[in-house]
Amino acid sequence: MGDDQEDDFPRRLSESMEDLSLDLGALQGSEYLQDLGLGAPSHSQPGETPDSRPTGEEPGRDSLFSSLAGSQDLSRRRSWERSRSCSESWRRLSLDASAVDEEPCLPRTLASLALNLPGGGLKTWTQGCLSGGGTPAESPGKECDSPKKRGRSRSVPVSFYEIRSPEISPGLEVPTPPVQGLEPPVLECMEKDHVEPDHVLIVQQVLQELRQYHGARQRACMSASPGGAHSNLTWFEFLSESEDGAGKNEKSDKSTSVKRRLSCLRSRVTRQKEKGKSPAHLKDKGQDARERRECVNGHQLLQGTFSGPSSCPLCGKPFLSSASLKEHPRGTLLSDGSPALSRNVGMTVSQKGGPQPTPSPAGPGTQLGPITGEMDEADSAFLKFKQTADDSLSLTSPNTESIFVEDPYTASLRSEIESDGHEFEAESWSLAVDAAYAKKQKREVVKRQDVLYELMQTEVHHVRTLKIMLKVYSRALQEELQFSSKAIGRLFPCADDLLETHSHFLARLKERRQESLEEGSDRNYVIQKIGDLLVQQFSGENGERMKEKYGVFCSGHNEAVSHYKLLLQQNKKFQNLIKKIGNFSIVRRLGVQECILLVTQRITKYPVLVERIIQNTEAGTEDYEDLTQALNLIKDIISQVDAKVSECEKGQRLREIAGKMDLKSSSKLKNGLTFRKEDMLQRQLHLEGMLCWKTTSGRLKDILAILLTDVLLLLQEKDQKYVFASVDSKPPVISLQKLIVREVANEEKAMFLISASLQGPEMYEIYTSSKEDRNAWMAHIQRAVESCPDEEEGPFSLPEEERKVVEARATRLRDFQERLSMKDQLIAQSLLEKQQIYLEMAEMGGLEDLPQPRGLFRGGDPSETLQGELILKSAMSEIEGIQSLICRQLGSANGQAEDGGSSTGPPRRAETFAGYDCTNSPTKNGSFKKKVSSTDPRPRDWRGPPNSPDLKLSDSDIPGSSEESPQVVEAPGTESDPRLPTVLESELVQRIQTLSQLLLNLQAVIAHQDSYVETQRAAIQEREKQFRLQSTRGNLLLEQERQRNFEKQREERAALEKLQSQLRHEQQRWERERQWQHQELERAGARLQEREGEARQLRERLEQERAELERQRQAYQHDLERLREAQRAVERERERLELLRRLKKQNTAPGALPPDTLAEAQPPSHPPSFNGEGLEGPRVSMLPSGVGPEYAERPEVARRDSAPTENRLAKSDVPIQLLSATNQFQRQAAVQQQIPTKLAASTKGGKDKGGKSRGSQRWESSASFDLKQQLLLNKLMGKDESTSRNRRSLSPILPGRHSPAPPPDPGFPAPSPPPADSPSEGFSLKAGGTALLPGPPAPSPLPATPLSAKEDASKEDVIFF
């Protein structure tokens, strides 16, 4: 069994070599491997074994490895017993690209340690291992066939929760005595080295395997002495002995399968990585991995970490625990051993529970607290390791950078920024204050406070951005990459000045917020005034500072971004440092470009916020005015910043053009000088663009025109380079000093450039793309010509001596002007002080109503200020007022003073008022009012107020005027002159004071006028002298062009004034028309209102008439109903009478009707209608008259033409509205039917008697119908005349004529046949076998008018039916 294992071990060792071939060339011969016992095989003879080392060092080494490796060996017991998700494994075993790739890593297995051994050393070392270590079935070999294979497959620790507490407690305390020669890692090393979790596993596994190798010969001794075994027991042996033997075979199989999976994954990942890398790159990386080591404070170490609180046995400093690395996965940069803040990293062992105390370096062992191991699958860890191993960087290399962490400075910066923004964490003011407090405010107040809150909040963010730029990025670049201030200034120009300015502004905003807090609350506030702070921030010194600094910062924006991108591409240290800083929580994804952009845009945010504040501020308030002023100031700052940015962009564009210029390209000027591309950079760019140059042949040539400070360049592009254009042998460099710009006639896009140089005038015809471009170019060129320095080139320029003389004269002239201006100001100040003295004197005299002194003259245009005419007119009017006042008072005096009396003044003239200069009342010394009263009132004698003899007008020097000077007269007055009233004296003093002020103003104006006139005269003389010295033909042309431009401008101004006048006239006319239209609208409105009133009245009248008509209609309907009732009653009475009459007649005839027949013969009573139905009513009512003995004799034959006749009668009825006596008569006559006389004569034979009786009945029926109709017409029409006429027209029909009987009513039932012996009253006509059925008796239509004799003679006799 042991031989099989010995034979199997080299085979598995070889497999492990092929699986993970890691290079340990960097560790060969090192002190570290010598201390571990691995130095001898690489330098000794093949036959020498590692066991030849002294055994005295092994116990110390055992204790050391128990201290360093024991904390993690326990957690590797059951790495295959728990499964983790892929995502969790990836997260927990995350590797940093900056800490793995270029660091020489320790091997994972013992087999990998022997990869670099010499030829025979591998075999000898392996045999020594087998012979000295015993059988693998001992303590470490209980779980698998080989401890080497177990160490490879169980490289991931497991949670301590899976191990029972009794099994852990015996081995928690492991003694760690100091060991000589071994230098484990300490805190100072860990502070500068970023530790990855996978490296932790590598170091722990190697230490475990080395401890197994060196302690193989000690196991027998340790097993012999229980106490020693307990004191020197290794973690590897403890874990092997404490494990049960139930699942050993199963775990061994799992170990083998895990190893095979790792080998497969490794080969796959390696192939994928090596596909994208060149062999040279892989070779360089292998060399870098051998060369990169670092020794810190005497500790030669590799990367690793240790779980739980541990300390270095050499230096005594505590190890950096895994819990301290969890806050920053990128590692820590700490100096002087300061601890790092806690942050979780992808470690496999995390600190649980409370904080563990750090043990003393002199302690016997290390206390392990309650920790939990979180393990991942080995294949996922290996895959992640191989993916990041090829591209990672080593932090221990001198070519790499250190990693930032939140040291005390960063922590203080974080707290500072958080304290700044603590008050403005809410999104708006409505959410920052209490909800109840916000609801009590008005809507406008809430909106205003929201905008103010947004202003302060954005200011906090801006200050935070500036602090990040300066205190994070700039500080890191200075300390880590040793960037100079100039280099940092290229990235963040003037950032420190901007931070200072905005920090001060933010502090003032916070103060204003604190002042506006409600009493008893630290949240509720309403800021009433903010405009004053904005005005102070954007005006004065602060405003100028913001203009300057923002101009510099915004101008360098593009350059800073370009420089940052260049550094990011070329400097790998810079790239890594920026990446590490980006992981700071304080940065919050604010990169360098984002910071620069935010600072650049901040100045443009203020106008929007201030405008919104103004919209929610009440107009007319003080804050509204301040906000408006602040808005104007901000816009002015932005415009100036834009101008600086534009100037900077133009300079950048000029440098680009100069960079594209051909090195050999140059141009010769007319004066012989050469213009090269270096001369371009000494000037400023005004405008550049593509134009067309027209040649003499008429072709247009594309050129690039560049307008500089004093020249205009015409360039051409050739082979992607710019050269000076050469067209018609004209110089492409045009001087602006004598350039004239003219328009081309009939060409909207062309312009002439005329160079009036004495060496040779030239004219260029330039075309643009549009008329607007032409006008823009002409305007820019003209402004450049006006601002061009007045220097002549070549021999026509003034000599240096003459130029110096001219400059000296101009300097002296300016000095004279300044001195004169200073003296004028002194004169004005003296006169103002003199006026103040007068006022004080007047106040001392008791006058308190005097006006306050004003400035002697206002500033502005000297042509307006130095106009003394208005002042002189005002003074004359005041003098006339004083004269009239005094004359009005003295004219009421009763007498004049006597001539006697002493007087200190000059003799009075004859024209003066007698007695005025000498009043008999005593004078009051020092009284201003009394002295005024003694002054001569005449204008030509009045020179000023009393007690001011030094103040005189300019004409006081004229001979003879001395007697008119004011004098103070003190003489005893007479009793006859009354004293001046107090009111008069007060008014007089006020007028004299006003007159004095006007005269002082006049004097100051005259002084200023003199200075101004003399200065202008000297300037004109100087210009004339210079003009004579420089009078050349070119200057004359240029002066003529300027004069032409001035005239053109004057004409344009006149045209503009004319247009303005026309506009005013049009506006006035429009106002008149609008006023007239308004009046017309008012009149039309008045008329409309009148018409509305009339229409309203008419509507009311119509309503009344309609109501009256409705009332009359109802009365008429009522009367009509009564008439119908009366008609029906009359009809019933008539029918009753008719029935009685027939009954009476029938009673006389044989065979009376039975009673039931009489009852049936009673007709229904219904009123006749007006539409012709009255003809049928009597017919129906007369039906019983035909029922009797005669009716049975009639045959049952009816005439076929009876129905059409009735229909024709019915169709010819006249409507009721056209019913009258005349048309009724005509209608009845029109429907009469004529029968030949022969047919009628055949029926007259033996029936005269019956015909007479039936004719009489028909006549009575017809008469009764006509009577009813006539009564109805009389009721409706109410006309007696028509009644009489209708009665005369109803003449009786001749008895010999009979009307034919109408056909029987189809709705009436047929009567029963009478007896045969009854007499027949009907008649029958038999002609051609046709029988005429006798109809029931019916009334005949109205008879027609009898025919005349001639008609009877010409026609046959007919019978009318």
UniProtKB/Swiss-Prot annotation:
Reported impact of residue 458 to A: In RP78; decreased function in positive regulation of Rho protein signal transduction; loss of function in regulation of actomyosin structure organization
Modified-residue entries (Phosphothreonine), positions: 912
Residue numbers bearing the Phosphoserine modification: 921, 1289, 1291
Composition bias type Pro residues, residue spans: 1300-1317, 1334-1344
Pfam families hit by this protein: PH_16 (PF17838), RhoGEF (PF00621)
An example molecular function term from Gene Ontology annotations: zinc ion binding
UniProt-listed GO biological process terms: actin cytoskeleton organization; negative regulation of stress fiber assembly; protein localization to cell-cell junction; regulation of cell shape; regulation of Rho protein signal transduction; small GTPase-mediated signal transduction
Tissue expression per record: Expressed in all tissues tested with highest expression in kidney and pancreas. Weakly or not expressed in liver, skeletal muscle and testis. Isoform 1: Expressed in eosinophils. Isoform 2: Expressed in eosinophils. Isoform 3: Expressed in eosinophils. Isoform 4: Not detected in eosinophils.
Main location: cytoplasm
Pathology noted in the entry: Retinitis pigmentosa 78: A form of retinitis pigmentosa, a retinal dystrophy belonging to the group of pigmentary retinopathies. Retinitis pigmentosa is characterized by retinal pigment deposits visible on fundus examination and primary loss of rod photoreceptor cells followed by secondary loss of cone photoreceptors. Patients typically have night vision blindness and loss of midperipheral visual field. As their condition progresses, they lose their far peripheral visual field and eventually central vision as well. RP78 inheritance is autosomal recessive.
Quaternary assembly: Interacts with SEPT9; the interaction may inhibit GEF activity. Interacts with Gbetagamma subunits GNB1 and GNG2. Interacts with EPB41L4B. Interacts with PATJ (via C-terminus).
Function according to Swiss-Prot or TrEMBL: Acts as a guanine nucleotide exchange factor (GEF) for RhoA GTPases. Its activation induces formation of actin stress fibers. Also acts as a GEF for RAC1, inducing production of reactive oxygen species (ROS). Does not act as a GEF for CDC42. The G protein beta-gamma (Gbetagamma) subunits of heterotrimeric G proteins act as activators, explaining the integrated effects of LPA and other G-protein coupled receptor agonists on actin stress fiber formation, cell shape change and ROS production. Required for EPB41L4B-mediated regulation of the circumferential actomyosin belt in epithelial cells.
Protein name per the record: Rho guanine nucleotide exchange factor 18
